[in-house]
Every structure is written in C-alpha cells, then in structure tokens.
Amino acid sequence: MLLAEELALIAIDPDSGRHAIGTRDKLNACLAGLLVVEAQFDERPDVPIIDAAREVLDDAGPKLKSVLSAMNRGLVRRLGSGTWDAVVQGLVAAEIVAPADGTVRPRHRVLETAQRDEIIDRLRAAAASDDPLPVNTAVLLSMTGPAQLLELVAPERAARKHARRRIDHALDATALEPVSQSVRKVLADAAAAVAVASSVAAIGAVTSG
C-alpha cells in the first residue's frame, strides 16, 4: 500500500465511510506531500498515480510549495480525479475500501478493517515512544498532524502533547524534512488567505452599512 493510501485509509471513518467534514483541503495537501515522497523514492513501475505525481513534480518543480499546490489540478488533468479521489481509487482497486455508494457525499465502506487498525496501531506506538522511527512510519506520522488526525493517533488527551511533538519533529534533520515543512507552509498560507478574505468582507459589510 502506498503511503498516501495509508493516510487516506485511516482518515476514512469506518462508521460514516467519509473523512471528517472540512478536512479535504488539508488531506489533499498531506496526500500531495506523500505522493511527492513516493514519486522521488518509490521505484515500482506502472503505478499510475505515482507516474502522474512524477509528471506534476517535473512540470511544477523544483519548489515544493509549487508542486504541492499544483498536485490536485495536475492529477485531475492526468487521471480525471483530484488528489483525494485518485488516492482512494487505489484503495478501491485493491479492495481495501468499497466503491463509492453514489450519494451526494460519497461513502466508502472500509472492507479491510484489520489493515486500517494495523496502521493506526503502528502510528500510535510511534507517537507514544521516543525511539528512532523507520522512514516510512516517520513520514506518515508527520502528516497526521496537518491532516487533523492527532486524536486518532493519540486518543488519550494526556498523551497528545508528546504525540504532537513527535508528529511535528518526526522528520527533523532528514532529507524529507522539506516536504513536511512545505505541507505545513501551504496550509498556513491558505489559512492566512482565508483570514484576510474574511476580514476584507467584514470591513466591506461595515462600510457599506
């Protein structure tokens, strides 16, 4: 399973068949970061989403922020689906989740709950420890924070401060640290843009009144 697929799988709530409301943009940024990692280091041939991510990387690079921002549109052009849907389609093809049920907000029933549980258990152990982490686990853990999955990784409130520190520093002093930093920067810039737009709208409403 690709790292991006692992993140998407744990983000799907088995009860609802969907990710949490309001997290799609955050998940897209994190999935884009994982696809960049896999495009650079995964040597498996003929994986369509990785091949498409490599093309986006070639077209939009070398600045990681530009690549991350371009990933969703780039995958739509190449695969016909945006980042989240393209990654989930890989889970559907592997029969890990069921095809979308066709509702307005599509749901994907998790078929391989044991695989989902194994990923969560691995991340919880990583977040709770201070031991060095395998690269794949460190990369995936680093994305659970910006993907708003902290409570999944650290269900006990008392453990969340330590887990947050592990998440935020999982890739420190590694070759993949720039990916983690760029994902967070893209999301911070997006949040700042929303805040500015809201302020402008509020000022406009006051002055027009």
Where are these regions (language model features)?
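Acidic, Ser/Thr/Pro-enriched low-complexity segments and adjacent helix/loop capping patches
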Residues: 72-82, 94-110, 114, 172-185
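Short hydrophobic helical membrane-anchoring segments positioned at the boundary
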Residues: 124-209
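Short, well-ordered loop/turn elements at secondary-structure boundaries
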Residues: 41, 92-93
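Leucine-rich, amphipathic alpha-helical/linker segments
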Residues: 60-86, 90-92, 128-155
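Residues that form generic nucleotide/phosphate-binding pockets
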Residues: 10, 52, 56, 70, ...
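Accessory beta->alpha helical hairpin/"wing" motif in late/C-terminal subdomains of nucleic-acid enzymes
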Residues: 44-58, 98-128, 134, 140, ...
